[in-house]
Structures are given as C-alpha cells and as structure tokens.
Amino acid sequence: MIVVDYITPLMESMKISAYYTIRISIIVLTTVFIVNYIMSTGIMKKLSNMLSPILRRLKVNPLSISSTLACFFSPTVGYSILAEGLKENKVNEREVIGASLANSFPSVLSHTFTFFIPVVVPILGHTGVLYVLIRLGVALAKTIIGFLYLSIISEDYSFEMPEINKLNKKENAKKSFKSTIRFAKRLIPIMFFMMTLVLYLSKIGFFDYVEKFVQPITNLLNLNPNVGILALTEIMNVQAAIVMAGGFLNEGILSSKEVLIGLIIGNVLTFSTRYVKHSLPLHVSLFGAKLGTKIVMVNAAITLLLDIFIIAGLLLI
C-alpha cells in the first residue's frame, strides 16, 4: 500500500510562503504608507491644477472639465460635481455620460497610486508594470472617447473651476499609518494563504489534475489551463488573483503573457458583478436609478469591448 505524504509538501510550502509574504509585505506596506502620505498632501490636486489651463481650451461644458480634474484626487468629488451641476441644470444628461467616460483615466490613475503601484508591481514585477500600463491604456482610451463625445455635444461655456478643499496635512502621517494597518490586515493573510495554496497544490500535482477539466476550453484559445484557474480566482477576489499570479510566475507555471491574459479574462468575467457592487450604488445615489444605471452600463460595455480587443491582441502575439 502506497502512503502519500501530504504533510511534508504543506510544511515546505508554508515555509516558502512565510518568507515570500514577509519579504513582499515589507515592500508593499512601505510603499502603501508613502503613497497614502503623498496622496494626502494634495499632489493629485496640484496635478489637476497643472492640467487645468490645457483642458480649458477644450470647447466643452466647464463642469465636465471640473469633474475630470477633481477625479485626479477624488473620483467621488468629481462625480458629485456632475450631480450638483445636473440638479442646477448647468449640465445635461448626455454631458454627464460623456464626462463619466472622460473621468476614467484620472480615476484609474488615483487607483494606480493606491493599489497598482504599491501592491501589483511588487508582487508581479515587470508583468505587474505591463498590467498597470494595460489598465491605464484602457482608461485613457475611455477618456479620449469621452472628450470626443463631449466636444460634439457640448456648448461653449465660460470656464469656472469649483473650489475643492485640501486635506489636512497635520493628520497625514496618522491617517496614512492607520490606512496601511487596515490594508495589512486584509493583504497579509490573503498573501500567505494564496501563496501557500499555490505552492502546495503545485507540489502535490493538483494543477495537473485540474488541467483535464479546464483543458477543453483553454485548448480552443491555445492557452495553459492554469490561465483559467487564475481568471476564476479573480472572480472571487482580485487581491487573491494577484498573489496567485505571483505564485504562478515564481514557480514557472505561467509565463508573463499568460498571467496578463488570465488577469484580463478575469476582469472580463467579473466586470458585471464589480460594476453592480461598486459603481452602481454610487451612480444611482448621485444621478438616480435611470441615469445612474445608464452611466454604469455605458462604461461597462466600453471597458468590456476594449478588454476583449486586448485579449485578442495578446493571443496573437
């Protein structure tokens, strides 16, 4: 009778995972603290002020421009400007939809500093950089589409930039530290668990077994079956998928291109639930059920289309 030893691979996986988690966590949490502190000093507001003279030259509703500039440091503030403008009849529904598209790049850019750079890049390395560039590229394309649409439908108004309050610098360090601790409580357990799981399942041959079930689908796209596992993991938890992707890269299970495809496929699979959970409540509360839903659907559809084009492009490389 053959006795399979499952304990030794588990202990080895936990040991490697603990070392990896400690090493990456130091980098990630230090970066998170620094980025949170810098963001609280109003750097994104300074960036919006720098871009203000350029954007003023666009012949679009000034509230649309104001909303886009505000989204560089607070997407919620940016959309609130549009909501107030709509109530006061200073902006119409079509302009709100166009502005919501135009707000994509500054909104994702702020997310880049709070999640992509401090978390994704340290875990995935150069693959993480490529993933960030892809997400920024999609957002930039949506912003360009939004401004093109606004330039067609908007009237030429006199520009008036709403006053936006700066954050209190005295509370920066304390606020950044608390934010980092909260983030650490979420990230470290997920990182340790997912890295241990990936290493352990790899050692006992689980991924070879799963390949038999996923292979028919992935074979159609000429992909490694583990790409499907990564995409399915992203449906459950984005951070878990990022950590799993890092494990796949470290173990040589997936290539850089396959990780990118897996993460983007996961993004496509989760786009509906993500928009419903995160975007829809905010937009409905600000713009009402009809317009709020329309804004979310337009943004989701364009994001989905662009992601599909990117997946197709990566498959052809």
Curated annotation (Swiss-Prot):
Disulfide bonds: none annotated. One of its GO terms (cellular component) is plasma membrane. It comes from the Archaea. The keyword Membrane applies. It is found in: Cell membrane. Keywords: Cell membrane, Membrane, Transmembrane, Transmembrane helix. The chain crosses the membrane at residues 24-44, 63-83, 136-156, 187-207, 229-249, 252-272, 295-315. The keyword Transmembrane helix applies. To M.jannaschii MJ0880, MJ1556 and MJ1589. This is Uncharacterized protein MJ0871. It comes from Methanocaldococcus jannaschii (strain ATCC 43067 / DSM 2661 / JAL-1 / JCM 10045 / NBRC 100440) (Methanococcus jannaschii).
